[in-house]
Amino acid sequence: MKRVTLLLVATMLAAVTATAQDWAKARLEKSPRHLEWVKVKHGDRVVNCFIAYPEVKDKAAAVIVIHEIFGLTDWVRGVADQLAEAGYIAIAPDLLSGSAPGGGGTAELGGADAVRKAISSLPPDQITADLNAVAEYVAKLPAGNGKLAVGGFCWGGGQTFRFATNNKNIKAAFAFYGTGPENEADLARINCPVYGFYGGNDNRVNATIPTSTELMKKAKKTYEPVTYEGAGHGFMRAGEDPAGNEANKKARDEAWKRWKDLLKKI
């Protein structure tokens, strides 16, 4: 009886997880835009990337989308599609490419815990090299106008802030609830404005904002954090979920508007 109960619980949890992803998958399936997978190669690395193209007449700016600690999920791919809907070429690299047995990435790692463990093991230099390779790839796209921005969420928000210290071609960095670097020499290399998006109920991350503000001011760099009261960590994803609470939905809508308005300035 105990075994049957455990199996039932496992089945119910799997069903909840599947349902939680349905709304993200549905967006991608209904998108009228050109969406595709590409392989970005550099050295002995192959980075699998999802790219979304806008339906526009003129050449477009590009945005690199850096995934959360959950890896490259349907929701992150949906963010890329929403950026394409707004008129931008959006590319989302799976920075876990090659981390799974057989050379796979996020999808082949087999669960959230395995993904988190793999993320924590990624060498910082490899992350930078992967992102630089992706930046070079989109810079050469015939449909692009050469302008590049980067945006990321959670773990990817921190990596967005960090990547701004390692690539001088970025026109703007959008860090969603991620912590910033604390090395003054690193921050001195930033060549673009950094815009922060934070949930009011996310003290783990928000406790680092004053330090980032002080260090960026000292380095004479632009850093503009905005906190959305009542929202939690991960509000961009949670606010898109039909079952999400109103505070996260409101924060998500306001953050998207701000993001799009700022992208128009690059």
Q: What is each stretch, according to the model?
A:
Residues 169-179:
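A conserved short beta-strand
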Residues 152-156, 160:
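Gly/Ala-rich beta-loop-alpha elbow adjacent to hydrolase catalytic centers
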